[in-house]
Amino acid sequence: MRTNPTTSSSVVSTLEEKNLGRIAQIIGPVLDVVFPPGKMPNIYNALVVEGRDTVGQQINVTCEVQQLLGNNRVRAVAMSATDGLMRGMEVIDTGAPLSVPVGGATLGRIFNVLGEPVDNLGPVDTRTTSPIHRSAPAFIQLDTKLSIFETGIKVVDLLAPYRRGGKIGLFGGAGVGKTVLIMELINNIAKAHGGVSVFGGVGERTREGNDLYMEMKESGVINEKNIAESKVALVYGQMNEPPGARMRVGLTALTMAEYFRDVNEQDVLLFIDNIFRFVQAGSEVSALLGRMPSAVGYQPTLSTEMGSLQERITSTKEGSITSIQAVYVPADDLTDPAPATTFAHLDATTVLSRVLAAKGIYPAVDPLDSTSTMLQPRIVGEEHYETAQRVKQTSQRYKELQDIIAILGLDELSEEDRLTVARARKIERFLSQPFFVAEVFTGSPGKYVGLAETIRGFQLILSGELDGLPEQAFYLVGNIDEATAKAMNLEVESKLKK
């Protein structure tokens, strides 16, 4: 960690002696630069090209050294468009890797891969910066205790609990509630854990990034009037950016998250959307650098690149980084090297279902497809484990009976199966929950439900104590007491109508 100005030009101006090179070759986003003998920059050093193009436009391109070619030449990958660059232009070696601003001043702001604000709200009020390339925490620094990261979302905490300092894969198509779930997690970690969040948009659509920013402002996750009260920092490397920017934007977001963990000693949520785009950008850079492709055309260093990112996402004795990563599966092929490499690092998967979303059950988390390595009796306890297993068994039996119900109707089922269906429908509805960030859209106040309350609620449904209550009483409520109160209100309303 060091303190210095954040812009590339001011970093350069503070260097006592500039190490200057010249561009020898430009191949799209890749530059070959010649330096004087004995003054070669190190791998991952940031190089800056400043000057004017043929029509007098100012050029300021930052590159990262990727290869030392010999004959005093290095090969670097540009972090922005190389339009206007020419052979012979002067290149300055900054003598250090890319550094980005960190700390509380980053909250509520949008950054690019270089840590420059792109939200037209002026410069960032911090002089503390950190290099994006760092080693993962040493083994002795790690907190190896297995503990649950409580989210306050019933379906997640009960059936696919997150690990503190773990990595979660978020699977879901368009329009099933990924963004709302992400925003609720950001909101809940701030309220329940006093934590903050960092969102890394890796190779995503500009429109989606803009929509997320607008929705965060609307729901209060980003506070426009008092930016210091915001709960999230956003880092975007969009689809139209060069591959170098898309490959490094995940590291920029992670570096900001590491500061909150290591210096502020906070619990941090790190969102990466989409982890596949990180791999894709690495593949493009690998091809541009002339490396021999590996399986399915991916880079030969796929596992190393993924590991260097994922191993920095962990719990230490100071705090934790819990990462939620959207995973795109190319052609729905789970054996593709990109998702297959990602799966090796995941502790839990949260699968969003379009069928549940169509029924109006939000969050539309599929209780049967979502998994977690934390759902073991020795970690969560016998009571939690038994309740979760019984909920899954009841839901699975209901799923098996749906074809029979569709053809023959409920009346043809046995008494036991009818009871199972009734309880499964109550469970399905009780897995829904009103969100704080959706208050402005639904008018229903959001609910944070503790794990103990969640377990108690499902135990009461499974035991049959609530068999007499109507299933609509369980829809979009917090804890089980609210469902009981809602049932009484429904009964009063029905009597008044009569």
Curated annotation (Swiss-Prot):
Claim: Cytoplasm is one of the keywords in the record: no
Residues involved in ATP binding: 172-179
Keywords: ATP synthesis, ATP-binding, CF(1), Chloroplast, Hydrogen ion transport, Ion transport, Membrane, Nucleotide-binding, Plastid, Thylakoid, Translocase, Transport
Gene Ontology molecular function: ATP binding; ATP hydrolysis activity; proton-transporting ATP synthase activity, rotational mechanism
Membrane topology field: Peripheral membrane protein
Listed GO CC annotations: chloroplast thylakoid membrane; mitochondrion; proton-transporting ATP synthase complex
Record bears the keyword Transport: yes
Enzyme Commission designation: 7.1.2.2
Family of this protein: Belongs to the ATPase alpha/beta chains family.
Task performed by this protein: Produces ATP from ADP in the presence of a proton gradient across the membrane. The catalytic sites are hosted primarily by the beta subunits.
Name of the protein in question: ATP synthase subunit beta, chloroplastic
